[in-house]
Amino acid sequence: MDSWQALNTFWKGFGLPAYDEQTVFFEGRSPAYPHITYESASGINGNTELLSASIWDRIDPDVSDTASWSWLKQKAEEIKNTIGYGGKKMVVGGGGIWIKIPETSPFARPMPSGADDILRIKMDIEVDYIGGL
């Protein structure tokens, strides 16, 4: 597994479809809601990248149990708990990536989406590229 695949595996581990931001609108199609979009980057040993991801959902006025900020915040909390205070390490080739919660910015926050019926929570993570896991 390479670092791209590891990030994809991590984000798909929360019961929602997850898409690299560069591929989410492949062939002009928008994915179904809810879903996760995430930034990805390849690094070398010793590098740290600050990346973001978003959980998206759509309010459907015809469905009573539709999207809510509460549900999105619970999902963000699940992701935060999975990363934990010590971070989450994943094996990548001869090394690995270490996903952490940044100390200098909030982990998750509601963000405007540009549409009244779309809800979005943006999350920031640090990814350290490490050798010899």
Residue ranges and their predicted role:
Residues R29-A32, N47:
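A short, polar/charged loop/turn motif at coil->beta-strand junctions and beta-hairpin connectors
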